[in-house]
Swiss-Prot record:
It comes from Saccharomyces cerevisiae (strain ATCC 204508 / S288c) (Baker's yeast). Associates with 90S and pre-40S pre-ribosomal particles. Interacts with CKA1, CKA2, CKB1, CKB2, PWP2, UTP15, UTP17 and UTP22. GO terms for cellular component: 90S preribosome; nucleolus; nucleoplasm; small-subunit processome. Residues 184-248 form a coiled coil. This is rRNA biogenesis protein RRP36. Residues 33-151 are annotated as: Disordered. The keyword rRNA processing applies. Residues 85-109 have a biased composition (Acidic residues). Residues 114-124 have a biased composition (Basic residues). It comes from the Eukaryota.
Amino acid sequence: MSYYFKNLKPDLNSDVEEDDGNLLESIMANKSKREIDEQESSDDELKTLSFGSLKKAETVIDEEDFKDTKPVHKKPITTTYREESFDEDEDSEDQSDEDAGFFEEDSEDETHHGQKVPKKKSKHAPVEQSSKKRVPRVRNIPGLEIPRNKRSNLYQDIRFDKSTGKALDSSIIRKRYQFLDEYREKEIDELQKLLQERKFLSKIDQGEREEMEQRLKSMKSRLQSMKNKDLEREILKEYENDMNKNNNTRYHLKKSEKRKVVQKWKFDHMKAKQREKVMERKRKKRLGKEFKQFEFHNRR
């Protein structure tokens, strides 16, 4: 290389450096102009927007910021462990230890997947029954159950059961089973004879004797009440037949009229002493009512 090229040094005021400086200045000037134009255009666009649209945009931005800043609460995952069954063979134990072990972890979401939490039902809610369930052959029909206060230890005859669907007519039943009165009278006579025997009374204690006397008394009253009902039924039947002899349409008495007819018949067929007792009882009853109506008995 020649001596001229070795001693050659770049000049600071050369033309190349001047061109580069001019380019940089022009680029920076263009950039500043572009930024100013963009700011002016954005200001012009904001001026054209209405206050309602600006308010909506502000609310949307606030909601997005609130969602971003809201803390996320993670549910704690509880793990349940299920023990697996294992065989007695050593090979199966080795395989189970290598694969999964004796315990497996199940998350709460997997165990309760697809199951709804049952809500507590009210005690006043109606009874629910599945339509897929078969109806049982033997069912409890409402109205046929005997209430507890009317239950007895006696045997219930199915001929008088409500499930037959027939109305119970006491007169018809009484005619069918009137022959039982003979057996009842025999039982009463036997009890009376037993209570009159001294040997029998010496063998039993006082409690058993009182129980037998009470039983005899109840049997007599029951039989007498049945006979009184039969008599009243016959009296009313005769009276209605006499009343409806010449009538085309049959006339039936009311309950109050029936009671008066029965009382009149009994009074007519009483003895003299019985009539006097009845009249005296009625007189005392009437005097008691009049005595209660006096002024000095009224409360002030």
